[in-house]
Amino acid sequence: RDADANAALALVFHAQAEPELADQYFHKALATRPGDPRLLNNYGSFLFAQKRYDLASEYFQQAAADTLYPERSRVFENLGVTSMRLGQRDTARQQLEKALHLNQRQPRALLEMAELSFEDRHYVPARDYYERFSLLSGQNARSLLLGVRLATVHEERDKAARFGQQLERLYPGTPEYQQYL
């Protein structure tokens, strides 16, 4: 009956790769508190991890409707990333911009905006988003590849080489490294 206990069990089962049980406990939690933005966001994140993007988006939108939810910026970040997966670039951009308007210190949203801007050939904003991301987060294969590409576009050969070496050293077997080659 306790929504928090059911939500906690849902997260435990999700972490233990038991999606059916996780889904069951999320439903129990949401049956008790259907409008709880934290539960809606967590369930949306679970659905996203299950690659159920349409449904995840619905739950994120419900969570975002609560204007008093303190983690609303994260919900918009989740909505933006989900919209990217659904191929809705314009919607994704709007949601990520809203996320960053609410909280400028979100590495995931910054990296997504850097990628979007780079793909749209808006290289100066892309570099700005990327540099803000780099101040807040460690690099991963995806961000290093974007770093190489941005440095190349801005004719910063040393920086491009440095990012490329990090990509080779830290992520040699990744698709990003293959793209770099």
Describe the residue ranges of each PLM region.
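Terminal, low-structured helical/coil segments at or just beyond the last alpha-helical repeat
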Residues: 133-181
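Residue-level recognition of tetratricopeptide repeat
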Residues: 2, 36, 70-72, 106, ...
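Structural marker of alpha-solenoid helical repeat scaffolds
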Residues: 1, 32-33, 66-68, 102, ...
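Canonical tetratricopeptide repeat
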Residues: 8-11, 42, 78, 112, ...
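Alpha-helical solenoid scaffolds that mediate protein-protein interactions
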Residues: 29, 63, 70, 99, ...
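Structural signature of tandem alpha-helical TPR/SEL1-like repeats
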Residues: 16-28, 50-62, 74, 86-98, ...
